């Protein structure tokens, strides 16, 4: 599917949301060295990592309603500040989505650390809030989007939707003509990939001026679709290199990601529930 989006420089503020910088101490069951290897195919020894030293930006809509069931968007930035466009924050509030943005995990950080931080944060939010398992999304911009695409495929049994803006990775080589191709950058277990193929929803956002546009179009058509992923949408936003996509583009993307929420079964009960 191909959909046109648009740009807008306006900004807005969030009403009724609570924003905190938080830390967690208990790792997720799916961030062990064995699980990272199974999900992403990395054979190297991962760097030293201490979850208790990591920080996250956490924004909870209608925080005063403690028993409200919410969705979750884990947002990955190319920089260390966990930047999330202010004009999008009201969209998340309308969709009743918690925002979790890891800090200090920009493009200079080791890829395995970025994956582990995102997954540990996801698990801990699910331990502390009532999260709708049918609406657990991961997204990002540029280098953050490349990591998000890896999470969406390698953790298709956890995340139900993936939003990639101006960046994407894929697990297979993607041909671009002749002997040229975009190389696959990770190697997940085939059973994990099958879960992402059949249940995951992927929205790729690009447009004129995006240096990654050709790759994103190729990955959408000759990667995801050729590899039989069921739900992949390419959104084209004119002038995307000059401004942030407007709120209506995020609305489009979330509508596509949420389309299956009423029919998808919740993930297996091994995933953590809220601790009362």
Question: What are these regions, as identified by a protein language model?
Answer:
Residues 10-71, 184, 220-222, 232, ...:
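A domain-start/cap signature at the N-terminus of enzymes
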Residues 63-69, 110-143, 153, 158:
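Gly/Ser-rich "nucleophile elbow"/oxyanion-hole loop immediately N-terminal to the catalytic nucleophile
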Residues 68-71, 97, 160, 200-201:
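Alpha/beta-hydrolase fold active-site loops
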Residues 74-76, 165, 237:
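Alpha/beta-hydrolase
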Residues 134-196:
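Primarily recognizes the serine-hydrolase "nucleophile elbow" in alpha/beta-hydrolase
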Residues 170-252, 258:
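The feature captures the conserved acid-bearing segment of alpha/beta-hydrolase catalytic domains
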